[in-house]
């Protein structure tokens, strides 16, 4: 609850000052003389403004969210499990904000490079920042959901030793996070949704197995 409240407060506060951040972000587009930015309507501007505000709120409040989850679970954990999950949550709480920041920072550079390398002579190329924002947000949420899935599966493997019960629970988590991934992806990912969801399931399952062995093995032995 405190994390959600902090996210809301940060998003609301940031919305009043986000214009400067957006100007810096737009300035990161490396444009040639024959490439321009296009913003189609006031609605697009407000969409961009609030999208940035909400994303910034999530980045700021995510470590607090991880702390809240850990405190909720702490009373029912053994000492070895506490150390393992505390280390896992600590890593995750920094990976997601860093990953989202990198995705948002790199997208304008990549978009500018693509627009510069693939254009028709005599035709002015226009980059739509709204599409870049939508792609950035979708990519950020895909990364966030994937990382949370890895964290959830790793936690399940650490806490549940019974393979049959653990496998059943992990399948349910896969289905839940597959639905979240489907919703998180914008139309820019049309045609890739099934591939991304399947790849996320396979990679997250393998990665969670290795992480559970790593974190639990360190503190157990």
What kind of region is each of these model predictions?
Residues 1-221:
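Membrane topogenic/interface segments and analogous intrinsically disordered interaction regions
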């Amino acid at each position: 609850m405190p994390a959600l409240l902090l996210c809301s407060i940060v998003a609301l506060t940031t919305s009043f000052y986000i214009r400067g951040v957006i100007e810096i972000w737009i300035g990161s587009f490396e444009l040639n003389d024959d490439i321009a930015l296009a913003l189609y309507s006031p609605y697009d501007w407000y969409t961009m403004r609030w999208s940035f505000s909400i994303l910034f709120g999530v980045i700021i409040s995510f470590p607090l969210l991880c702390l809240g989850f850990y405190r909720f679970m702490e009373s029912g954990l053994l000492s070895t499990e506490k150390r393992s999950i505390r280390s896992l949550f600590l890593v995750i709480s920094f990976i997601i904000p860093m990953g989202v920041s990198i995705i948002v920072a790199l997208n304008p550079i990549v978009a500018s490079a693509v627009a510069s390398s693939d254009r028709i002579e005599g035709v002015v190329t226009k980059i739509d920042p709204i599409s870049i924002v939508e792609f950035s947000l979708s990519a950020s949420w895909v990364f966030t959901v994937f990382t949370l899935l890895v964290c959830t599966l790793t936690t399940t493997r650490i806490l549940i030793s019974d393979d049959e019960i653990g496998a059943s629970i992990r399948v349910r988590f896969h289905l839940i996070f597959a639905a979240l991934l489907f919703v998180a992806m914008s139309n820019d990912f049309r045609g890739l949704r099934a591939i991304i969801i399947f790849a996320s399931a396979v990679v997250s399952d393998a990665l969670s197995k290795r992480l559970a062995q790593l974190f639990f093995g360190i503190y157990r032995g």
